[in-house]
Amino acid sequence: MASLEDGTYRLRAVTTSNPDPGVGGEYATVEGARQPVKAEPSTPPFFERQIWQVTRNSDGQSTIKYQGLNAPFEYGFSYDQLEQNAPVIAGDPKEYILQLVPSTTDVYIIRAPIQRVGVDVEVGVQGNNLVYKFFPVDGSGGDRPAWRFTRE
């Protein structure tokens, strides 16, 4: 399985069944420290708050950190709790597993490396918030949220 190279990216919300939906879309957007990460269009005033640094760690997991201008301290994809539909928070960066979606080169499922009996915990969108979604580990459960990583 190909791994994502370290670098700066914009993260567009897509799905495993439709990894290339065409023009437009919503992108992971920081609102501020300790605030939920939003899904917003890639237009002003959101555009400058959609740049993320992805760094792969020695254990094969990755951190996704906000790379915007004038950030007073380091924050990235994080969580207070990993419950169904709990928001992704811009906080102390946590580690995630990035799983390449088959038949794509730049679309990944973002999975929290947390052991839950029978489920994978994945980053998706509900309304305009990034949230944690639970899916059966056996691959059932239908279409899954995924993210197109576009290099900056």
Curated annotation (Swiss-Prot):
InterPro entries documented for this protein: Prot_inh_I48_clitocypin
This protein's UniProt keywords: Protease inhibitor, Thiol protease inhibitor
Pfam entry (one): Inhibitor_I48
Annotated GO MF terms: cysteine-type endopeptidase inhibitor activity
Transmembrane regions: none
Subunit structure: Homodimer.
Assigned protein family: Belongs to the protease inhibitor I48 family.
Function: Binds and inhibits cysteine proteinases. Inhibits most strongly papain and cathepsin L, more weakly bromelain and cathepsin B while it is completely ineffective against cathepsin H.
Name the record gives this protein: Clitocypin-5
Taxonomic source organism: Clitocybe nebularis (Clouded agaric)
Gene that this sequence comes from: clt5
